[in-house]
């Protein structure tokens, strides 16, 4: 019998490689969708339909010279991109891809997610500080302030889901969303305010437009990674796209039924052999990926639809609007759990 640690290691290996491939596909998808929105062709020269363009970009990063700023802290400067990638890949281990298919099935999975989201601030801050550049430092400080500000609202949105599901385990949160019927059991229907807040804060946490203040080209050149080149810059690039993909996964997992197939109970009633089968697991995985692909498209769509916030507007939205609304929403759901006997902690 194969030990459980071997299965965990194999699962982690597969997830890491899947995230690497997904990041490449996201780069290609963003370029093509952006080109479509801007009415231009997009990459179409490297390989059929430009499909090999992301791999050409990786080769470019590998072959580029790695320039180290003269007065920088060399060790921290080199470790910052590694920290970002490791945290992004670790977060991917919490995603339930189908019923029973998850690398780390933790009873405190939600707390683990919030913890990993919090410590990702360190990679950005250390990159800005260690570069010995005012642009990098300001970009790092902006990013830290932004991420800390929006983590509070994100945490409250997640707490509202935990109160409804009565569990901190992602698998149980997904399964709880099957209790209300085809789509009515989704937390997006039961908790629309929490869903909207989580989506907005996910944009801010991943530094995606219109919340990409740490990389405001007009003010800070490239922000916290201004002084990075070669594969170190490529690692920041990779971490950003992996975080974007993972954010889409957790939006779907927490609010849109995760891997649950619409009308899944009816399908199992018609075909009882489906229950617990490999075919059902494949259907669940396809359902999850379709939902995730939609939200990945939404990230691109929003980037080319809304202008970037000013820094004071960014802070105002986070502290003056999102945080009070998220807190009020969590309190109302907690009262509902107590007064109406809903499933709670």
Curated annotation (Swiss-Prot):
Its main location: membrane. It is a multi-pass membrane protein. Keywords: Cell inner membrane, Cell membrane, Membrane, NAD, Quinone, Translocase, Transmembrane, Transmembrane helix, Ubiquinone. Coiled coil: none annotated. It catalyses: a quinone + NADH + 5 H(+)(in) = a quinol + NAD(+) + 4 H(+)(out). The chain crosses the membrane at residues 9-29, 82-102, 108-128, 154-174, 183-203, 241-261, 282-302, 325-345. GO terms for molecular function: NADH dehydrogenase activity; oxidoreductase activity, acting on NAD(P)H, quinone or similar compound as acceptor; quinone binding. One of its GO terms (cellular component) is plasma membrane. InterPro entries: NADH_UbQ_OxRdtase_su1/FPO, NADH_UbQ_OxRdtase_su1_CS. Its EC number is 7.1.1.-. It is found in: Cell inner membrane. One of its GO terms (biological process) is aerobic respiration. NDH-1 shuttles electrons from NADH, via FMN and iron-sulfur (Fe-S) centers, to quinones in the respiratory chain. The immediate electron acceptor for the enzyme in this species is believed to be ubiquinone. Couples the redox reaction to proton translocation (for every two electrons transferred, four hydrogen ions are translocated across the cytoplasmic membrane), and thus conserves the redox energy in a proton gradient. This subunit may bind ubiquinone. NDH-1 is composed of 14 different subunits. Subunits NuoA, H, J, K, L, M, N constitute the membrane sector of the complex. HAMAP family: NDH1_NuoH. Belongs to the complex I subunit 1 family. This is NADH-quinone oxidoreductase subunit H. It comes from Salinibacter ruber (strain DSM 13855 / M31).
